[in-house]
């Protein structure tokens, strides 16, 4: 039995998910998901009764990928979303692109992998206390490192192309959508009234401009992913109560990226107290 996060139509409405774009900007393919028009502002109103079940299906898809130990890539480069995308992806131990999407990030993964290796080499050079490079040379390397880290930092540990994408605003991220479609990678995406739903595996009709709406989508996505990870661990015999507060990390072993658990500081402190108490009772 899945333990997906709970969400209601009221939750969606309170986050402004139902507000679409001006009617002049609409994509007719989104008509099935539009409730009507706000007469004063002349914007489309999204039918949240349609959004809710589609959202639940999409969250179940993310849960399933996480349960199987798959890689999930969060994509959102618009200014309303970039920081939320990064923090929520990190919270569930997954990956993200929150600045400019570089063409070929998926379809030319070999080149991207080489760039990631270069990034790591730069970091190694900069962390070498015995480096014989001049201050100017190190400064140039630092600039190159920062540029690569901004573009690739969120996927540096991914190890291979993702198993599914979670996208905010398919119009802005059209290159990511195109590459995912070409490779047959499933897409979970927020689609506003000006978006094209064709080829989107799991579409979620909703406002893709409001920070409050974006925060809700990303939180639900992350909570669904964490639920999938926890269910997978529970199936392996790990008690869920034992992993609360732990950090989930991705490690590569024998070419396979696996989700692993790093015990939290609180857990370690509690464990230390138990050992101390046992010693005192002897």
From Swiss-Prot:
On the tree of life, the source organism's domain of life is Bacteria
Q: Which Gene3D superfamilies match?
A: Glucose-6-phosphate isomerase like protein, domain 1, Helix hairpin bin
The protein's GO terms of the molecular function aspect are:
structural constituent of ribosome
Which residue ranges are recorded for the region named Disordered?
260-282
Regions that span the bilayer: none
For this record, the Gene Ontology CC terms, alphabetical, are: cytosolic small ribosomal subunit
Q: List all Basic and acidic residues biased stretches.
A: 266-282
Tell me the Gene Ontology biological-process terms attached to this UniProt entry.
translation
Which terms are listed as keywords in the entry?
Answer: Ribonucleoprotein, Ribosomal protein
Q: Please report which protein family the annotation says this sequence is part of.
A: Belongs to the universal ribosomal protein uS2 family.
Which named protein is this?
A: Small ribosomal subunit protein uS2
The species this protein was found in: Wolbachia pipientis wMel
